[in-house]
Amino acid sequence: MERITVTLGERSYPITIAAGLFNEPASFLPLKSGDQVMLVTNETLAPLYLDKVRGVLERAGVNVDSVILPDGEQYKSLTVLDTVFTALLKKPHGRDTTLVALGGGVIGDLTGFAAASYQRGVRFIQVPTTLLSQVDSSVGGKTAVNHPLGKNMIGAFYQPASVVVDLDCLKTLPARELASGLAEVIKYGIILDADFFTWLEGNLDALLRLDGPAMAYCIRRCCELKAEVVAADEREAGLRALLNLGHTFGHAIEAEMGYGNWLHGEAVAAGIVMAARASERLGQFSSADTQRIIALLERAGLPVNGPCEMSAQDYLPHMLRDKKVLAGELRLVLPLAIGKSEVRGGVSHEVVLSAIADCQQA
């Protein structure tokens, strides 16, 4: 069992990583006998894990209610959020309740925002079931729902009480979802850790076949990097923005194509290559390193070009609504070398459009 602490003073919390955690009531600390829980999951995961998690919590004396939501990025919305609020109010659940997010990034983000909002804030626990959510979205307290005009535009910074990463969940993960998560894994190597990127080049095949030790190390290293960044910059005033490599371009793809048509990691993968191309055009990133990135993404089964349905001009309206925009100026996360990156303002639209055009499908 691995345990990593996100250090935020009195709001610090553990990330527990191991196989078989759903069999151990102690995995779900700080829950205790007599606590009330609303377990939030989706229609795909409920048949797989709902009864198992409910059972382990009830054996610990926890009172468990549940709400099952539709599955998909398109349901990460205010309308579906209201379904959670209605379930909480009907029981009813008070300020001493705990929300448990059992699912991937959509469930985690939506449940976290529900916890931040319900009765001005209640406790919640992240139980991520996809690789993407285990290495990224469950850690750090970013919670949100989407708006038709932009991804994650309505939300809050709100930290969980704990994160429970059961590696066994990856056994039921579709191959496309596994690849989507690998985009975020590869991102960490590009922005923060050249040695980890090199490790990924040598161990990607092991990750694709869900090799236990390789996957445990991969998830642990990603969580360590994320925990360090969040501890240093919880509210994304500087360093934490680096975690958005590829996301400004990627969010534009998701919004323009319709949420769910491109998985988040797929859009981020294409966005990472666009960011690398932009950095190349600015003379601060080598084409050889871009090719290393492209090769690793392609081995993971990820796209390295944007959708053929989008022109370069289609990206800009979405990108200018990005949360990193200041005073109307586009700011991009750009790689400087494998393992090193920066947030750069003042990148011309010409450079951005050219970088996108470099990544257009033929």
Curated annotation (Swiss-Prot):
EC number: 4.2.3.4
Catalytic activity: 7-phospho-2-dehydro-3-deoxy-D-arabino-heptonate = 3-dehydroquinate + phosphate
Names of required cofactors: Co(2+); Zn(2+); NAD(+)
Enzymatic class: lyase
Involved pathway(s): Metabolic intermediate biosynthesis; chorismate biosynthesis; chorismate from D-erythrose 4-phosphate and phosphoenolpyruvate: step 2/7
Residues at which NAD(+) binds: 71-76, 105-109, 129-130, 142, 151, 169-172
Residues binding Zn(2+): 184, 247, 264
GO molecular function: 3-dehydroquinate synthase activity; metal ion binding; nucleotide binding
Annotated localization: Cytoplasm
Protein name: 3-dehydroquinate synthase
